[in-house]
């Protein structure tokens, strides 16, 4: 067995030394601490495999149950074995409820402690393997897609991850800002340390103040509970929709950013090392101009600016995203894995997706739920199975609403109506990219330019690459 680090926290030196000697004989690597401050410092520097914790800890700033609470919140997989010579059944029950692996009384049998410790480490090992297995089955930090916009975005994320600067992620609701933050953390040097998400949107000013800085109107809550900033020490703190933080808290956050020091109400100062990532779906510059966001705070947080592309800009990724969501839902929601027809994919690509990736996932899930697999006849998802609002707002490619009117038209006029609908839909599908549209429909670019002009289809450019082609098409 490879050596496992085990922390022994007890206020009695003789007990610490005795347990440490016994653990060393059994192949463990013991680390000792006399109080909560020493113990939490040891764990923050390098998480241990297990903790043996005395419940009383005389002379310690935080008692055993308080230390247990902190460990289980910061490092939920570390097993904690409680030991005490003055315990009661009520204390033991409370410790187990708070997440302790087990509870034994002093004086204890050394063999029993060793067996308990080995069992706790083995259980934790199995939990970690299970988590690793689940993460391999489906990676929650996977950025699906291979279009040019997505590839460029992936490169920007890599640059952000290698930077030590603070990062602000800009993107529309549902575009995947949290995913971007997770990817940055995953690819950074802090990957093995905490990734903490803080969302202040639905919190009161008092609650935000308490969570970030440990300040509460209830004096008994002050100083005891570790803050979000302490939880994120040595790791990454992701603040979602940072523009929703009230001005008084912005002032405190700005002060914290200057030296990354937390000052508790009691006056105690704690230095932390955190990579801070923030996100917003609002135009922060407008918020600054309107006096809703501190300009200095904006500049300190927006050192590295990352823009998340909307799904509208990534329409070519929709087929891959649909496959990904179908596979995800079949594995974790029990829904049967299905195939979306080319016509259904085309309908999805023709929609503008104001709700972005999140909306697409919801649509895929709704479609699978509302069209259960009953026979082989409905194994393939057809356009009519997709939510009606998606089809109603998609470009008119999968159906011809004017089919009855066209029956009364001469062939030349009917063909013009069809071509206008068809090319309009295809241009929308490929985000107004002339090259990709011409390739798909089987026309030369110059021929497509002429056809668009002939049909009076003036498609505005969506990026600089298309500007020259747009001018040619509308010349």
Swiss-Prot record:
InterPro entries associated with the record: AAA+_ATPase, CheY-like_superfamily, Homeodomain-like_sf, HTH_Fis, P-loop_NTPase, Sig_transdc_resp-reg_receiver, Sigma_54_int, Sigma_54_int_dom_CS
Concerning SUPFAM superfamilies, the annotation shows: CheY-like, Homeodomain-like, P-loop containing nucleoside triphosphate hydrolases
* PANTHER family in the cross-refs: TRANSCRIPTIONAL REGULATOR (NTRC FAMILY), TRANSCRIPTIONAL REGULATORY PROTEIN
Which SMART domains does UniProt cross-reference here?
AAA, REC
Q: What does this protein do?
A: Member of the two-component regulatory system RT0550/RT0603.
Q: Where is the Sigma-54 factor interaction domain?
A: 143-369
Spell out the Pfam families in the cross-references: HTH_8, Response_reg, Sigma54_activat
Does Transcription count among this protein's keywords? yes
* Chain ranges of the Response regulatory domain: 5-121
- 4-aspartylphosphate modification sites are 54
Q: Which GO terms describe its biological process?
A: phosphorelay signal transduction system; regulation of DNA-templated transcription
Q: Which UniProt keyword terms apply here?
A: ATP-binding, Nucleotide-binding, Phosphoprotein, Transcription, Transcription regulation, Two-component regulatory system
Example GO molecular function: ATP hydrolysis activity
For ATP, which residues are the binding ones?
A: 171-178, 232-241
Q: What is this protein called?
A: Putative response regulator NtrX-like
